[in-house]
């Protein structure tokens, strides 16, 4: 059988875009957006998504779900592609340089940056903890604008002068109740945050899942990722 699952640049980019199910698609939806309700819907503690759903003990889940869509012969390649497309460990200029030299190796870094291991959302207050549980930052954020193009996100900002790389918080429409995970970016340069493939945040999109996610939420999240990225494939 023809192997349809080489990790080409265009496909990897499509994978990341497809996982964000909401896209700020039309003006009416944007007009109805309630920024306070949205950030409130994210209440909870989050760990890195792909360290959970792409852990070795999840291999069988991925394989089973991929087999159901692309067939047994292509399932392993599809599973490997999906699990690695968002687990790069470089972003920004390092990623730009690497992927310019080898476009077929392009992937997204979907991990937390800035020494953060856990994000905590509590209404408009967002904080980040390091590996020892120490608080790295804690600020209150207020909605300022949408970025409807390229990354499609809602931008929140803190007025705290010492926020540094945590000044802006760009949230996708994802919520744990609807898509079992969240996607977001953060930084001090709003123009750079609005670009996926250029600037200091190139090839980076943080993704989180509730720290206390149960087996069903994890399973549903994997199913969503597989369905949205392999739906157009046909098992031979």
For every predicted segment, state its role:
Residues 1-9:
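Bacterial N-terminal signal peptides that target proteins for export
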Residues 10-19:
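Bacterial N-terminal signal peptides
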Residues 17, 46, 181-183:
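Polar/charged side chains located within well-ordered beta-strands of beta-rich proteins
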Residues 18-31:
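Sec-dependent signal peptide cleavage junction
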Residues 31-37:
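Extreme N-terminus of proteins, especially the signal/transit-peptide cleavage junction
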Residues 36, 47-124, 165-175:
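Short, solvent-exposed loop/hinge segments that bridge or flank secondary-structure elements
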Residues 40-45:
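A glycine-anchored, Pro-Gly-centered beta-turn/N-cap motif
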Residues 100-236:
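Calycin-type beta-barrel ligand-binding domains and close structural analogs
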């Amino acid at each position: 059988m023809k192997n349809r699952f080489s990790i080409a640049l265009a496909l990897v980019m499509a994978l990341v875009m497809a996982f964000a199910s909401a896209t700020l698609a039309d003006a009416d939806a944007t007009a109805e957006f309630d920024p306070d309700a949205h950030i409130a819907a994210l209440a909870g503690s989050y760990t890195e998504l792909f360290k959970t759903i792409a852990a070795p003990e999840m291999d069988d889940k991925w394989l089973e779900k991929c087999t159901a869509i692309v067939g047994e012969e292509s399932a392993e390649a599809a599973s490997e592609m999906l699990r690695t497309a968002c687990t790069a460990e470089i972003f920004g200029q390092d990623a730009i340089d690497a992927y310019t030299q080898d476009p077929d190796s392009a992937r997204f870094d979907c991990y937390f940056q800035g020494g953060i291991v856990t994000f905590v959302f509590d209404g408009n207050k967002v904080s980040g903890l390091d590996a020892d549980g120490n608080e790295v930052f804690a600020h209150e954020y207020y909605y300022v604008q949408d970025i409807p193009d390229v990354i499609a996100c809602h931008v929140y900002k803190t007025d705290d002068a010492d926020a540094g790389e945590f000044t802006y918080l760009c949230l996708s429409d994802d919520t744990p109740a609807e898509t079992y995970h969240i996607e977001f970016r953060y930084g001090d340069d709003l123009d750079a945050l609005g670009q996926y493939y250029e600037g200091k945040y190139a090839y980076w999109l943080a993704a989180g899942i509730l720290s206390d996610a149960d087996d069903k939420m994890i399973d549903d999240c994997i199913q969503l990722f597989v369905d949205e990225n392999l739906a157009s494939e046909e098992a031979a």
